[in-house]
Regions:
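Phosphate-binding loop that captures ATP/GTP phosphates
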Residues: 1-52
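Residue-level recognition of beta-strand->loop/alpha-helix junctions
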Residues: 3, 54, 144-146
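Conserved nucleotide-binding/hydrolysis micro-motifs of P-loop NTPases
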Residues: 6-8, 57-60, 115, 149
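Charged, low-complexity, helix/coiled-coil-prone segments
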Residues: 10-25, 62-73, 110, 165-166
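Generic detector of well-ordered alpha-helical segments enriched in charged/polar residues
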Residues: 24-27, 41-42, 71, 75, ...
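Conserved catalytic-core segment of NTP-binding enzymes
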Residues: 72-163
Length: 183
């Protein structure tokens, strides 16, 4: 399962799809205390065997939930959706990601080998140490993510994403790991 939390993912064009519902709808139901499994299932789309929720279209919708509320929502998705693994891109929460990261058993941090990226990671690790979040720091696994090229024919992009280098990479990370979200 995949919940993509990214401001502008490009998936609409790459997948040639305009979704009627997305993560914004789920956030709305959650805030109205109307979240339940039927609503969740009405928002889930499938790409092969991967269940996913289309990302927010309007970035301001991220402000509707605190990071703690988003962590609670993700827990409900796992519990009520009967999922064992949840993959998140939490970049839009910035330093407010701690409530989300504290819930995770593993935090994969994509890194690059340039000085700017190395300094950003160093600052984040320093922040974790300064704020006493050593438990989160211990969960971080730095990874080098393969480039998604999309191939020559964009109509095959979904299959290439799942079964190409990126899909192989993610499957190898998750192989044998279940219940990656702490209870």
């Amino acid at each position: 399962m995949l919940s993509v939390l990214d401001t502008f993912t490009g998936f609409t064009g790459l997948l040639n799809e305009r979704w009627k519902r997305d993560l914004s709808d789920l956030i709305y139901y959650y805030k109205q205390e109307r979240f339940h499994i039927v609503r969740l299932n009405s928002l889930v789309y499938y790409l092969g065997d991967m269940a996913w929720i289309p990302p927010i279209r309007i970035p301001q919708d991220y402000a509707q939930l605190t990071a703690q509320e988003m962590a609670d929502l993700m827990e409900r998705i796992l519990r009520e959706g009967n999922y064992t693994t949840l993959v998140l891109d939490i970049g839009d929460y910035g330093r407010d990601t701690l409530p989300l990261l504290e819930k995770c058993q593993v935090v994969y941090a994509p890194i690059r080998e340039d000085p700017f990226s190395a300094e950003k990671m160093r600052e984040f690790e320093e922040y974790l140490e300064t704020t006493g979040n050593n438990a989160v720091a211990e969960k971080i696994q730095k990874i080098h993510v393969p480039m998604v090229t999309g191939g020559r024919r964009m109509e095959h992009f979904p299959q290439e994403l799942l079964w190409g280098d990126m899909g192989d990479f993610v499957r190898s990370l998750l192989k044998g790991q279940r219940n990656l979200w702490d209870n």
